[in-house]
Amino acid sequence: MADSKPLRTLDGDPVAVEALLQDVFGIVVDEAILKGTSASEKVCEWKEPEELKQLLDLELQSQGESREQILERCRTVIHYSVKTGHPRFFNQLFSGLDPHALAGRIITESLNTSQYTYEIAPVFVLMEEEVLKKLRALVGWNSGDGVFCPGGSISNMYAMNLARFQRYPDCKQRGLRALPPLALFTSKECHYSITKGAAFLGLGTDSVRVVKADERGRMIPEDLERQIILAEAEGSVPFLVSATSGTTVLGAFDPLDAIADVCQRHGLWFHVDAAWGGSVLLSRTHRHLLDGIQRADSVAWNPHKLLAAGLQCSALLLRDTSNLLKRCHGSQASYLFQQDKFYDVALDTGDKVVQCGRRVDCLKLWLMWKAQGGQGLERRIDQAFALTRYLVEEIKKREGFELVMEPEFVNVCFWFVPPSLRGKKESPDYSQRLSQVAPVLKERMVKKGTMMIGYQPHGTRANFFRMVVANPILAQADIDFLLGELELLGQDL
């Protein structure tokens, strides 16, 4: 039988290759896309690790398998994977499945090129610059630079490295020997990549000075200034402030204008981690949350989050026009960046980054933007805010639900208080018992497969749920289901 042939025999057989891929695409459309985004299907099919290993048959063998076996493996992989495009996947800051962005991702994978030179990626070199130009314009810059990075964490680390290089350019050659003790400043609500970046870049986690935040999670500029003065008095050299627009848990937006004033007074690089909240710049109604972002030196922005461009799509944007990226990271590899090419070598952007090979991440965003237009993407943002308001009002109406605080963004943080704890807030063990509720409900919902929502403690607060309203296909019915399902799962607690 033809189907029993090992797939290695398809090399050089275009008819067989086409037949295989048609079948695979059919499985992807049916199982991952149509079922994976249907509210009538499960979000996940939970299995314990050992059982899942057996079901997947993960061991790699010396002999190839038949086409039918491979197709069945594709079905199995999809079946047991979490469907992040599902309207009831609320677990992360990314969700949803934009079909135009997905088309861009499929084309990207099919062409399998690297973003480093114009000669092998002419379309994408030009496209990346146009997309970055548009993002910079939304920030408020008429000129500048930028690059797509493998995730927002790396974007933040790039900003830290650029700030250090601008202050001490000798460190590129001499390393840490060229540096005095440095200090950088960020809110206690910042993303953990700032601390990781300090360790990765050799600055050490002690170089990160944590600035106080207010009750809503926003950096307090007065404490920032106090921390800067204190660091100088202790013999450190301040060089960077990292503010956050859209914190991971509370969804807070730091007061950028006031922070920019502090940075200007002290001559510090001003970075804004807008990985989560940057897409709000598309909304004329809500972009005021990022007032002052145009004063930043660098901005991290992840369209794969609120815009649903698909993982990963992470831009680092710079106000700099002095070719700082290339001066900081360039190594002039002669086999790749020859200076006597037959075209303008300024188009070879690969020496701007620390990577060599670099994935094409601009096509999915460009194609989605072409299809939706800026107005369509703006409606997507505004709809997320409107659904957030709906959820907040529903929480206020229902017994057993309590907001942690009024949301500023599309992160809605709340407690589900089960029947046994209602009216007992004054009990000495109330917080401890309440903290046990979210983990139990999370286990129940995941094993049932009905939805996924994250939880966490925060400071002295007991574990609470963080609902992320981001999926473009999310509707009021999904909000109602979320609340009803929590009531159902927790009725015996």
From Swiss-Prot:
Superkingdom, natural source:
Eukaryota
Q: What reaction(s) does this enzyme catalyze?
A: L-aspartate + H(+) = beta-alanine + CO2; 3-sulfino-L-alanine + H(+) = hypotaurine + CO2; L-cysteate + H(+) = taurine + CO2
Which Pfam families does this UniProt record tie to the protein? Answer: Pyridoxal_deC (PF00282)
Q: In which pathway does it act?
A: Organosulfur biosynthesis; taurine biosynthesis; hypotaurine from L-cysteine: step 2/2
What Gene Ontology cellular-component terms does the record carry? cytoplasm
Keywords, A to Z, come to:
Decarboxylase, Lyase, Pyridoxal phosphate
Activity control: Activated by Mn(2+). Inhibited by bis-carboxymethyl-trithiocarbonate, ethylxanthogenacetic acid and 2,5-disulfoaniline. Not affected by Li(+) within 0.05-40 mM concentration range.
Distribution of this protein across tissues and organs = Expressed in kidney and liver not detected in lymphoid tissues and lung. Expressed in kidney, liver and brain. 7 and 4 times higher expression in kidney and liver than in brain, respectively. Low level of detection in skeletal muscle. Expressed in brain, olfactory bulb, liver, skeletal muscle and kidney with the highest expression in liver and lowest in skeletal muscle (at protein level).
Q: Which GO terms describe its molecular function?
A: aspartate 1-decarboxylase activity; carboxy-lyase activity; pyridoxal phosphate binding; sulfinoalanine decarboxylase activity
Q: Which cofactor does it need?
A: pyridoxal 5'-phosphate
Please indicate if the UniProt record lists RNA-binding as a keyword: no
Q: Which residues are annotated with the PTM N6-(pyridoxal phosphate)lysine?
A: 305
Q: Under which EC number(s) is this enzyme classified?
A: 4.1.1.29, 4.1.1.11
The UniProt entry's GO biological process terms, in alphabetical order, are:
L-cysteine catabolic process to hypotaurine; L-cysteine catabolic process to taurine; taurine biosynthetic process; taurine metabolic process
Q: Which InterPro entries match?
A: PyrdxlP-dep_de-COase, PyrdxlP-dep_Trfase, PyrdxlP-dep_Trfase_major, Pyridoxal-P_BS
Family that this chain belongs to: Belongs to the group II decarboxylase family.
Q: Which PANTHER family did the record assign?
A: CYSTEINE SULFINIC ACID DECARBOXYLASE, GLUTAMATE DECARBOXYLASE-RELATED
Purpose: Catalyzes the decarboxylation of L-aspartate, 3-sulfino-L-alanine (cysteine sulfinic acid), and L-cysteate to beta-alanine, hypotaurine and taurine, respectively. The preferred substrate is 3-sulfino-L-alanine. Does not exhibit any decarboxylation activity toward glutamate.
Self-association and partners: Homodimer.
Q: What is this protein called?
A: Cysteine sulfinic acid decarboxylase
Q: What organism is the protein native to?
A: Mus musculus
Q: Which gene encodes it?
A: Csad
